[in-house]
Amino acid sequence: MKLALLPWILMLLSTIPGPGFTAGAQGSCSLRCGAQDGLCSCHPTCSGLGTCCEDFLDYCLEILPSSGSMMGGKDFVVQHLKWTDPTDGVICRFKESIQTLGYVDDFYQVHCISPLLYESGYIPFTISMDNGRSFPHAGTWLAAHPYKVSESEKSQLVNETHWQYYGTSDTRGNLNLTWDTSALPTPAVTIELWGYEETGKPYSGNWTSKWSYLYPLATNIPNTGFFTFTPKPASPQYQRWKVGALRISSSRNYPGEKDVRALWTNDHALAWHLGDDFRADSVAWARAQCLAWEALEDQLPNFLTELPDCPCTLAQARADSGRFFTDYGCDIEHGSVCTYHPGAVHCVRSVQASPRYGSGQQCCYTAAGTQLLTSDSTSGSTPDRGHDWGAPPYRTPPRVPGMSHWLYDVISFYYCCLWAPECPRYMKRRPSSDCRNYRPPRLASAFGDPHFVTFDGTSFSFSGNGEYVLLETTLSDLRVQGRAQPGRMPNGTQARGTGLTAVAVQEDNSDVIEVRLAGGSRVLEVLLNQKVLSFTEQNWMDLKGMFLSVAAQDKVSIMLSSGAGLEVGVQGPFLSVSILLPEKFLTHTRGLLGTLNNNPRDDFTLRNGQVLPLNASAQQVFQFGADWAVSNTSSLFTYDSWLLVYQFVYGPKHNPNFKPLFPDETTLSPSQTEDVARLCEGDRFCILDVMSTGSSSVGNATRIAHQLHQHRLKSLQPVVSCGWLPPPANGHKEGLRYLEGSVVRFSCNNGYSLVGPESSTCQADGKWSMPTPECQPGRSYTVLLSIIFGGLAIVALISIIYMMLHRRRKSNMTMWSSQP
């Protein structure tokens, strides 16, 4: 009887509303957030398990909003904590060193103001309610790159181009600024200019970054959400700042007061505040700045050798999502507004900064999928000395997100290309990478019932019920695990097929990310170190050892520091997962997704090294899958309900009592065969899933997932590149594509003649069929022919005139001799 009641007991336990607390427990979460020992728990999983200390939410804080710009000034409120006692002062301390003043509002809610930071990602903070004597309350704040927060959280430069070209050509007049007054509830505001600089010897210990308050544009003006002014040149002591941002804050604050509630503009080129010398001759001023940048750049280390080569095609760039990600400044999915790269439809950036110099790669592509190179056009992609997204450990040059990039790569572009005609100097020091050394990553996937396609191309099905090792690597201690659970038949009974319901990943000592279906639904839930994340504010997160992106409700992308990448998405009632591994992982993998070594024959390798043949029976393959079950000590999964605890912690990781439906155990009726053939279009995985679940929708989802895998695999096929081919001196070329089969044609300027081949073809061996020809001084064929025919015409004309004159003379002589 007790055994029969157990499933019902588990069901009731799993539906206990959270957060739950351990009744009567005397323990406290003061200074214990994350701890699981003691009489009660302060761990994030305690809410679902009902084991929390009674003061859990008072000390382990939830905040709203939970994120904001790294520029600071965001007011956030602590949820659940009500403070009715008198307080000497509220102090919020970020990263154990940066303190801001908080307050208690009229509703007894505690507030903090986020500080100005030089890094992005999750920032731990603590709160003191006794003016700094103790900090027992703890939480985390997500600091985001300024360009990745919503526009409503910033003040807006109306016609930003006008601001950044002010003083050039005939760009004059008023400048306008707007903001959302509800985001800054105060009757009067002050508008200030802040400047950013990095000082000290580059790449030394005294290289520092700093935001500085410069001067006010307006003080104590009504908070109307609009400000207009005519810029005047700044005083000489402020003109060394060329990059900065405006800050709007309450007029109650003293000038330049740090870390107060405020709205910032985007960082921008401060053309509008530069001196009279800039306004008198902006081209000469910018040229001098460009030459100075050029001289400094030539003294700095060469960062280009550290950068990865760009993918050869747009398809490769979009498919290689572990190493490259969309550049928000040129996104094909958002209208291809490519301000700095006209002619491009999409750009990507290398996800990880280079290890030594913190630099970044950029790759841009045309609508035809061809890479745009600076050697051919100023619209080409340009690498960055400072990665736009920054680089851990952040805080110091050139690793400050956004700002280091502005100083070393963007403002110099204004000097050389936008304000002065010196762009070749810039492009020489920021040349596009071609793709001769690019190697696409290797792809493996799992989807449907589930079905697996290994890195070496072996495909099989394994309907296990449990938690399994999808991938382990010895190169970087990368671990990817999957949880598979039974599906449901159309009549509600348990199917004899399973599917992935959770995927977890960790690399070395990185954070742990788990992606799962929430509560048996088709809604994705993402957990960071066993705590559920919210994506209502941010869809991009900088985490320890990885980046996380949620571009849609049904897909999560995880980019690891090694260059490996995962994409987890919803396909029907289950999850699908695709894993991308760079070539360096060759011979370093094991698990259900095989041994990556270009040899599919050893993909069914057991833990003990025994290898099953590729023609192993379905039952043997099932035993292979079961052998890769995880253990309690190695599991990356979160067990935050008693149902999960009893099933996967107290129970076996692989359920030996679950009997899947093997392909040879069932057949379809003729009518079913016809329906399935029409639905599945020959996809055997789709057919198997219709048979095991009785659901055509499940089969269709599997077919789509398989097609997506095949499409990505096709996009990632290696492409031969012959590299950039220059035009001849004093001539030009036709053709900007340098991949196998491409033809480049040559011609010469007037006054020069072509010596050598008229075209060259990129061959399969990566070499051009012909070298670039020469254009030698001399008359071109066109000019020569013109001279020849012109000379002949002149000779003919002289001959005609001579003949006419001769005839006239003869006629005159005849007339004279006939007179009397």
From Swiss-Prot:
Glycans are attached at residues 159, 176, 491. Residues 804-820 are cytoplasmic. Its main location: membrane. Residues 720-777 form the Sushi domain. The chain crosses the membrane at residues 783-803. Residues 282-430 form the AMOP domain. Disulfide bonds join 29-33, 29-42, 33-60, 40-42, 40-53, 46-52, 53-60, 722-762, 748-775. Residues 23-782 are extracellular. SMART domains: AMOP (SM00723), CCP (SM00032), VWD (SM00216). It holds the Pfam family AMOP. This is Sushi domain-containing protein 2. It comes from Mus musculus (Mouse). The lineage of its organism: Eukaryota, Metazoa, Chordata, Craniata, Vertebrata. The gene is Susd2.
